[in-house]
Every structure is written in structure tokens, then in C-alpha cells.
Amino acid sequence: NKVLAGWNGLAITGLVAAWRASAHTPALALALRVAKFIRDRMVNGDQLARVHHEGTTKQLDGTLDDYAFCGAAFLELAEATGDRAWWDLGARLLGAARTKFVSEEDGVLVFYLAPAGDSLLVHRPESHQDGAIPSGASIFTAALIRLGVVAGDADALALAERYLVQRLTGPTQVNAWANSALLA
């Protein structure tokens, strides 16, 4: 039994959406159960573990996908339950993601998949294309907008706006098919 933070963050978001659409209480209960597992076993301060396997946290720090998917899921859960603690946890993880994964390279804003100094990687990849699942950058951008609009976090909103303008116009313009979640 392996728990991947990011995939479970997506599951939480999906379960909350199912509950909102159907008022099916077990969906919200399951979302809370999964979120509590992540909070209790995979979060340490502002660090989110990527993998929990057989009772042990396997990798101390997650990727942008993990932070974005879980951070956004916790914001969703806060709005669904009215429990401010979920919002605070989501905001804390998204704040950590700003520090770990956001960089500026030659005037271009980059959202990296891995944190700087990750000793497991030879190359530090960017997170900017959606595939079978949305990219961490897309979900991170949407969560930054939510923090800006709902909580009045002007820095989060400015970062999201800058990233969107940069990715959707000019020399770094991206393919719309590869960025459907970013455009949503």
C-alpha cells in the first residue's frame, strides 16, 4: 500500500467535486479521511512528503505536483467544510511551493517540478504541460489565483498573473492543447 501525495490531492479534489454535485455525504467523508492521512503522516511543518509506503515516509520532499495538488485540495476542503485549518494548511503548502519551485531565469518566470538542489536529478525539469493529469504548474497557478481572490494575497495573485501572461503570450507562448488546465 503506497500513498502518493499528489495523486491523493487530486482524489480529494475530485471527491469534494462529487460531493458538491450530488450531496453524497460519503464522498466528503472519504475526502476528509484521505486529507487527514496526508496531514498527519506526510506533512511536517511546511514540508510535504512525496511517498508514504508501508507505514514509512519514503521521500522527505515532494514535487511541485504534490504541493500544488494537495495545497489546492486543502483549499477545496476548507470551502466545503468551513474548517479554516484546511485553508491554513493549503496556504502553507502553497507558500512553501513558491519558495521551492518558483524561479526566474533570464527574466522568464519558471515553475520547476523539483526543488533546487535535488540530488536525485541531473536536470531540473519544468512543470508546464498538462497530460493525462494536469501539470503542477496549472493547478499551482489556479490555487494562487484562489489565494489572491479569496484571501487577499496580492503577491500570489501577481505571481499567477505574471505566469499566465508569460505562458500565454510572447516568445514563451505555449501550445493550448498541452495546457488545457492552465487555460481553464
Tell me what each language-model feature is:
Residues 1-184:
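Glycan-recognition and catalytic cores of secretory/periplasmic carbohydrate-active enzymes
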